[in-house]
């Protein structure tokens, strides 16, 4: 399970180092094999261990292909998916096209989302986190299920 928000840096080639606290789990779960693709809702990237991504591919494969919204989602997620592997130093290279989509430069945030990570530009992450916090404080902003979840 991946949790927490980690400030990380991209080097001039677009490589970033996976925080050490996740490396052993990623090597154990998927031999360091990752899939990175765009997030279809937020201006960030999603980084999946290979096995988690394969579950998503199976779900996408089962969608009715005659529905335009299904094809659209398949094109976005699968069409932008790139296979990556952690190198011996625990780094991986984010392709230029995906860096451009998420507006990644030097400072980024790797945010654990249980079964995957989101990779954000640091300024964009800070703005979204602040807006999310303000939104959930609004009266009626949370469903009963979410209110019961908050400790």
From Swiss-Prot:
Forms oligomers. Its main location: cytoplasm. Keywords: Cytoplasm, DNA-binding, Repeat, Transcription, Transcription regulation. It is found in: Cytoplasm, Nucleoid. Disulfide bonds: none annotated. Belongs to the MraZ family. It comes from the Bacteria. InterPro entries: MraZ, MraZ_C, MraZ_dom, MraZ_N, MraZ_sf, SpoVT-AbrB_dom, SpoVT-AbrB_sf. PROSITE patterns: SPOVT_ABRB. It comes from Ectopseudomonas mendocina (strain ymp). This is Transcriptional regulator MraZ. Signal peptide: none annotated. SUPFAM superfamilies: AbrB/MazE/MraZ-like. Residues 5-52, 81-124 form the SpoVT-AbrB domain. One of its GO terms (cellular component) is cytoplasm.
